[in-house]
Regions:
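C-terminal nucleotide
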Residues: 1-92, 132, 141-151, 159-250
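Glycine/charged-rich beta-loop-alpha catalytic/anionic-binding loops adjacent to active sites
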Residues: 47-54, 96-108
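Helix-loop-helix module between adjacent transmembrane segments
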Residues: 69, 108-110
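Short hydrophobic "helix-edge" motifs at membrane interfaces and signal-peptide entry regions
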Residues: 104-106, 148-149, 155
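DPxDG-like acidic metal-binding loop motif
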Residues: 110-132
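Conserved phosphate/anionic-ligand binding catalytic regions in large, soluble enzymes, centered on
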Residues: 116, 154-155, 159
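A sequence/structural signal of beta-propeller blade repeats
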Residues: 136-137
């Protein structure tokens, strides 16, 4: 929808219990392989070759996201500017192995955009570790590409909402290349003592996978479904109305 009509969304980045709920740590290791760890899932995987690294298309796998992120960062032949006979040789040329540790303190399928924001966090950590000089907009764009690699698809609102702090209105123009403009909004309705206690983030325990929902919406778009297109247009207007209400302190 954003490609031919432009998109609008009001988004709020929050911490949970005073901590960033998604955290990623990257450090070098002496062995020329890649070690992936998940604190919340209690899982670990050691990657020693390109085939294992590019095995990232299993939806729900604990390490699909870091595998795809490393692939995009150039640690797989398809995205590398140089050719190497093996992953071990590439890591040796890089100077070390890599160890990535993930912590996701949000239930999977919560609807809070966890997967997209985690992907951006992993890409950001790899960017810092490897000195790739990506900015926030680059990271959000690469997150779109990463989700295509995972076959889950997705839009841009989740990662922009998490990577850029605070309350904001995100808007994009129609066109194949989506570069949303970030307009920050006042946060008094969420932080002022008179209003702060009016907001509650409550976990129902109900989960869902975005892939199926996205497939249904995209299919309806291709079929030019009137009801679906009408709802999407209403959602875009609703975002603008909501931003105006926040600006008015209403």
């Amino acid at each position: 929808y954003s490609l031919y009509s432009g998109g609008s969304v009001v988004n709020l980045a929050i911490e949970l219990n005073g901590q960033p709920p998604l955290q990623v740590y990257v450090k070098p290791c002496k062995e020329y392989h890649i070690t992936l760890r998940s604190i919340d899932m209690g899982a670990m995987e050691v990657i020693r070759n390109y085939e294992e690294l590019q095995d990232y298309k299993k939806v729900g796998s604990p390490f699909s996201i870091p595998k795809a992120a490393l692939t995009l960062a150039g640690f797989a032949p398809a995205f590398s500017t140089e050719s190497y006979p093996s992953l071990a040789k590439q890591l040796e040329d890089f100077g070390s192995g890599i160890e990535i540790t993930l912590l996701a303190a949000i239930p999977a399928g919560s609807g809070l955009g966890t997967s997209s924001i985690l992907a951006s966090t992993v890409l950001g950590a790899i960017n810092d570790f490897c000195g790739l000089a990506w900015d926030r907009n680059d990271i959000c764009s690469y997150t779109l590409a990463l989700e295509q690699l995972l076959t889950t698809g997705g839009g841009w609102h989740d990662q922009y909402g998490g990577v850029f702090p605070g309350v904001k209105l995100l808007q994009s123009e129609a066109g194949f290349e989506q570069n949303p403009l970030v307009r920050w909004l006042p946060d008094a309705l969420f932080t002022h003592p008179d209003y702060r206690d009016c907001h509650l983030l409550y976990y129902t325990g109900i989960t869902r996978t975005a892939k199926g929902i996205l497939a249904e919406i995209v299919s309806s778009m291709f079929l030019n479904s009137g009801p679906h297109l009408s709802l999407l247009a209403e959602m875009k207007v609703h975002a603008t109305d909501m931003s105006e209400a926040i600006l008015r302190g209403n």
